[in-house]
């Protein structure tokens, strides 16, 4: 399962509820983006980062 490299966000599972409260399964997927970053050793690394983490954090992108 895909996971955010920074925040650890993954897919959430739950139910969709109709007006009559009938339940059907559904999933919520994290908005993950493929990004190349430069890690602390100076190496380029391809990781998946959530869009929120990408906006909030100032990463050194490759």
UniProtKB/Swiss-Prot annotation:
Pfam families with a match to the protein in the record: Ribosomal_L28
One record GO biological process: translation
InterPro entries: Bacterial_rp_bL28, Ribosomal_bL28, Ribosomal_bL28/bL31-like_sf, Ribosomal_bL28_bact-type, Ribosomal_bL28_sf
NCBIfam families (UniProt xref): L28
Stated family: Belongs to the bacterial ribosomal protein bL28 family.
Bilayer-spanning residue ranges: none
Keyword RNA-binding in record: no
Gene Ontology terms, MF aspect: structural constituent of ribosome
Alphabetical keyword list: Ribonucleoprotein, Ribosomal protein
Any one Gene Ontology cellular component term annotated for this protein: ribosome
Name the UniProt record assigns to this protein: Large ribosomal subunit protein bL28
């Amino acid at each position: 399962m895909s996971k955010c490299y920074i925040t650890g966000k993954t897919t959430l599972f739950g139910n969709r509820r109709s007006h009559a409260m009938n339940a059907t399964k559904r999933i919520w997927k994290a908005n993950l983006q493929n990004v190349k970053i430069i890690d602390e050793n100076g190496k380029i690394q391809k990781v998946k980062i959530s869009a929120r983490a990408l906006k909030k954090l100032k990463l050194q992108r490759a």
